[in-house]
Amino acid sequence: MLEDIIVLVSLGILLLALIWLLARMVSALRLQRAWVKGWGRLAEQYGMTFDSGYTRCSITGMYQGRIIYTLGTFRAGMVQQMTTSNYTSNTLLIKANHLPPTLRNPDEDTLFAQGFTLESGSQEFLDRLFLRRSLRERLAPLARMPGLEISLSGEELSLSTPRLYTQSDELLRFLEAMSDLARGIEDIRLVNGAQR
């Protein structure tokens, strides 16, 4: 009698584990379908190359005259890389901060100022880069994305996030923000050894 109860409890636990595993598989399949559909739509819309797999997808091509490469994986999230002309050879690191719950509906300037930590080898470069309000406004919504990092090293501008974004409008928002940032970086040039 006791052995029968132990067997039934064990079978019940096994059945629950199997149901949980099946639910996870169905959820992963739905996410993968949405991912392929969203990324494929963006690639098709802008004439880019889309490569899909079960656990990773990538988009390669040109966007507003810049070479881009976007890679997404289930485990690591997403990385987007874009070429730019970094005439001043500066470095840049933008990290999204954890926003306090008291900051409910901030304006773009407040969101940008409190939502990001900015680092560079040159404070003058940072000041000149973010002098334009339109660039700060374009980047400000990205501060709401936990773990987001944007870096500039050499001629490569890179965005990474631990979350996988699957919708084409989300990817387009990243592309537009990165393109505006690249344009701002390119506008800072050396003239006779001095920045203008």
What kind of region is each of these model predictions?
Residues A17-Q45:
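Transmembrane-cytosolic junction motif
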Residues M1-G12:
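Feature marks short, highly hydrophobic, charge-poor N-terminal signal-anchor/signal peptide-like helices
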Residues S10, V36-G77, Q81, S85-R196:
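Charged, low-complexity intrinsically disordered regions
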